[in-house]
Amino acid sequence: MPDPRFFEDLGPATLAELASLSGARLADPATGHQLVSHVAPLESAGPGAVTFLSDPKRLADLAGLSGAVCFLRPEHAADAPPGCALLLTNHPQASWAAAAHRLHASRRHDGAQPVHPDCELEEGVLLAPGVVIGQGARIGRGTQVGPGVVIGPGVAVGRDCRIGANAVIGFALVGDRVSIHAGAVIGEAGFGAAGGPTGVVDLPQLGRVVLQDGVTIGANSCVDRGAFGDTTIGENSKIDNLVHVAHNVRLGRNCVAAAFTGISGSTVVGDGVAFGGKAGVADHLTIGAGANIGAAASVFKSVPAGETWTGFPARPLKRWLRETAWLSRKAGGRGIKGPE
């Protein structure tokens, strides 16, 4: 269930209504009156929830869906358990997105007053000119908020934080002693898109961002909120300027990421990992605790704990050095020769 501090519940809908909105069809017309109240990921959908299956590799996950509703392709209907109502479509993700928009809406600042009267500011909070704070937001003692900062509805900011000019924070829970530098964007929608019958559609991002105590986010860096769950930056981790952390990433404690690092969605990073500048990490990987990723490395496979990887594609440092030396020898020891 999306966090009600950040998302408004628009009320239940019948399966018949969702089928009409999404372009799907009911596998069993008798289920058209069944009510759905919220969306959920496939692995945790229960009674009252609607989810989707688009990846055939996850067919085994259908077994736990008794009482839930699922968008899926017609050829996968036979794999669903009894008691799971089905909405059949060739575009499960896009159809689910239409249902999600019907059931949930992001809470937005109404704009009537820059600082909403329903926000809570503890003693010693300093607000510079031009700050916008949404309904239900809470800011802890001693926090300093720079000019032009936007803090969205429901956001919780801890004590003794420093928020730089023009930073934007939404859909987020921020710990104590966190520094967010100028222009950083925390909690915007992660990149989710799927093909639909009339073209590509955006997938709703219904999760949050959690910044634990002592985190630093550099200028103009972005940390996207999760698709369903949380994007988490662990305690005392330090992120440089111009870094992008995608949705559902879990970054451990005491990690460092130099400028232009990009960490793709749902990657899990252990404690004490260091990323050199311009390092790129593909999605759904695991970077083990204490690993080091070299500058400009492109990581397409999970990295074991404590290892140092670099290169394109990234591989263990000793292997990269050996292969680079071999290439140099083959090129005559002086690289590739140009024209004399």
UniProtKB/Swiss-Prot annotation:
It is an enzyme of class 2 (transferase). One of its GO terms (biological process) is lipid A biosynthetic process. One of its GO terms (molecular function) is N-acyltransferase activity. The keyword Transcription regulation does not apply. Pathway: Bacterial outer membrane biogenesis; LPS lipid A biosynthesis. Homotrimer. Catalyzes the N-acylation of UDP-3-O-acylglucosamine using 3-hydroxyacyl-ACP as the acyl donor. Is involved in the biosynthesis of lipid A, a phosphorylated glycolipid that anchors the lipopolysaccharide to the outer membrane of the cell. This is UDP-3-O-acylglucosamine N-acyltransferase. The gene is lpxD.
